[in-house]
Regions:
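Sec-dependent signal peptide recognition
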Residues: 1-7
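C-terminal motif of bacterial Sec signal peptides marking the signal peptidase cleavage site
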Residues: 11-14
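Sequence contexts marking disulfide-bonded cysteines in secreted/extracellular proteins
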Residues: 16, 45-47, 68-70, 91-93, ...
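Proline-rich, low-complexity linker regions of envelope-associated factors in Gram-negative bacteria
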Residues: 17-43, 47
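Catalytic cores and adjacent binding grooves of peptidoglycan-active enzymes
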Residues: 20-23, 58, 96, 108-110, ...
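Active-site acidic/histidine clusters and adjacent loop/turn architecture
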Residues: 38-122
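Acidic helix-start/capping segments at beta-turn-to-alpha-helix junctions
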Residues: 60-74, 119-132, 201-214
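Active-site-adjacent substructure of cysteine-protease-like catalytic cores
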Residues: 112-148
Length: 219
């Protein structure tokens, strides 16, 4: 009966529009369950957008992992035309924004400012059932990673062998490297609702946190 009630609540919530179909929280450590729900129009449109630009991806089953953590309307990116390490399941909206950023911002900026082609993007992952890091003295809050709605990008590998990392190069002595990183952050801020960099706090000293929300927060 509990499972039926949970699925009914989710189905009713899905009727409200959008794709924020996170299940009611279950205790942390609960056994993951697969949710058999209709795919909303917004998610189907997102899948179509990825297919339209030639992205290979696999839709993932909606799953509730307990403790407020879930993957709803998510995909596994397989081939975006550029190798990306560390990518796991992520909500389709953040995947779509990530693809646009990689293709239309990172690639041309590297060519223009660094004189070389990006051959790999390194990330620190996407989905992770955890709280926001760096909230000392404030109540715990689930991270965007807990719903697969965020990605952490750490470095870019160039064809000429250079590795441009957020940790080492954010305040690089090389003005072109600094300009490249600042430029791609500005572009990310136009595509993602939240972008956090080493300028935000110590918890982001080694990556750019990219989240598909409506916060309009860029640091």
């Amino acid at each position: 009966m509990k499972r039926i009630a949970l699925l009914l609540a989710l189905a009713l919530a899905a009727c409200g529009g959008g794709d924020d179909r996170r299940p009611p929280p279950r205790p942390a450590g609960s056994k993951p369950i697969t949710l058999n729900l209709p795919t909303p129009k917004e998610t189907r449109a997102c899948f179509a957008d990825l297919s339209r630009v030639g992205i290979r991806y696999s839709p993932l089953p909606d799953r509730d992992y307990g403790g407020g953590c879930s993957l709803i309307g998510s995909v596994q990116l397989i081939d975006i035309g550029l190798p990306v390490t560390g990518i796991k399941g992520m909500r389709c909206g953040v995947a779509r924004a990530f693809v646009g950023w990689a293709r239309n911002a990172i690639a041309p900026a590297a060519h223009q400012m660094l004189g070389s082609e990006v051959v790999r993007i390194e990330t620190m992952g996407t989905y992770a059932c955890r709280n926001v890091v760096g909230r000392s003295g404030r109540p715990a809050k689930l991270s965007g990673h807990a719903s697969g709605n965020a990605a952490d990008v750490s470095a870019f590998i160039l064809r000429d062998g250079r590795r441009i990392s957020i940790e080492r190069d954010w305040r690089s002595d090389d003005p072109q490297v600094r300009e490249f990183l600042q430029t791609i952050r500005k572009s990310a801020c136009k595509r993602f609702g939240t972008v956090l960099s080493p300028d935000y706090n110590a918890a982001h000293y080694n990556h750019l946190h990219l989240e598909d929300d409506r916060a309009n927060f860029c640091r």
